[in-house]
């Protein structure tokens, strides 16, 4: 549980300051959602090209120093188009448990890395990137999972749950 009074106070403050403080720093995320929504077509004949366009405005959401999930999933889509298409179809299947879908996406990325990685050390398809893909497709239902932010909010709200690295499924239940 968490302190509901702190939650309400934080929410009021966030809403009060949103336009002046938050929106300038957050607008690009919603532009990325719009770009994704406009370009996403899982049945595209040029799936890799479509994926490139759909993810083109994600910027630091799917790329940072030594972390390249967008570039890697696009590279996999160029090499193994039907496998990556199937990964996204399963990820976006709302009839299945979200934690199972995320785990399956990671495992399939592992297999792609083994087969097509050409010595790459990792595929970068972890909870943060996968939750970003979910959020881009269903922004009213999902948001980007970032353990450091989850912990910060948990601390601010005086939550009694301890969020741990690698315990994504448990963390998701308690968010």
Model-identified regions with their sequence ranges:
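An N-terminal alpha-helical hairpin/helix-loop-helix interaction module that forms a charged
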Residues: 1-123, 138-173
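Contiguous, well-ordered alpha-helical segments that form the cores/surfaces of helical PPI scaffolds
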Residues: 130-137
């Amino acid at each position: 549980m968490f302190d509901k009074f702190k939650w309400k106070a934080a929410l009021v403050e966030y809403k009060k300051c949103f336009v002046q403080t938050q929106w300038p720093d957050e607008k690009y995320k919603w532009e990325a959602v719009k770009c994704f929504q406009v370009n996403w077509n899982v049945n595209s004949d040029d799936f890799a090209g479509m994926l490139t366009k759909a993810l083109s405005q994600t910027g630091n959401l799917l790329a940072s120093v030594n972390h390249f999930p967008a570039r890697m999933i696009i590279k996999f889509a160029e090499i193994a188009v039907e496998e990556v298409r199937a990964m996204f179809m399963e990820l976006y299947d709302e009839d299945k448990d979200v934690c199972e879908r995320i785990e399956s996406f990671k495992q399939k990325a592992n297999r792609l890395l083994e087969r097509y990685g050409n010595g790459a050390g990792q595929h970068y398809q972890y909870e943060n990137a996968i939750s970003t893909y979910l959020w881009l497709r269903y922004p009213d239902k999902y948001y980007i999972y970032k353990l450091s932010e989850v912990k910060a909010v948990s601390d601010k709200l005086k939550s009694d749950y301890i969020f741990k690295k690698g315990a994504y499924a448990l963390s998701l239940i308690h968010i």
